Amino acid sequence: MKKILSLLVLMAVFTSCEEDVKFNTPAVQGFKNNELWKADAFTATLTVDGSLVIQATSGLETVVLKTSGYTPATYTLAVNDRNKASYSTIDDSGAASDYQTIAPDGTGQIIISGDPRETDLAKGYISGSFHFNAVNDEGLIVYFADGVFYKVPITGVQ
């Protein structure tokens, strides 16, 4: 009887241990004003002038990250127009709100990963991290922290 009971306990333990881990590859996400923001769709584009543009959308919200290059490096935002981030949204009434890092009080960084397991232009994907404060015309600030873009597919050159 003890053996049967032990066997039943072991069976219950092993059948209840199910791993429900979902991998988010590729992905663009971060914390917008302390709440998790995850993109539904995203693309990375290399431009003819050598810059990188990553566009990520979630419903009626869009984040655009632009760097002056696509080589692994840290790109400081708000210094010039070539390195910038923007966030835009459309509310229920159809009014658009646009936030930019090139406005006063806009700051941040985009870091392109140099790890060949994460960024491989020949295979067509790029990874890195970002954080930024962006300001709209009324002076309101939206901030993104702990942002990550991981193995975002490069869709082409424009």
Q: Across the structure, where does each feature detected by a protein language model lie?
A:
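Acidic, metal-coordinating catalytic segment for phosphate/diphosphate chemistry
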Residues: 25
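C-terminal or internal capping secondary-structure element at the end of a domain, subdomain, or sheet
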Residues: 115-158
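Surface-exposed helix/loop patches within compact recognition domains
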Residues: 28, 38-123
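Sec-dependent signal peptide recognition
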Residues: 2-7
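Well-ordered beta-strand positions in beta-sheet-rich domains
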Residues: 36, 64, 109, 141-149
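Bacterial signal peptide processing site
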Residues: 18-21
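C-terminal motif of bacterial Sec signal peptides marking the signal peptidase cleavage site
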Residues: 13-16
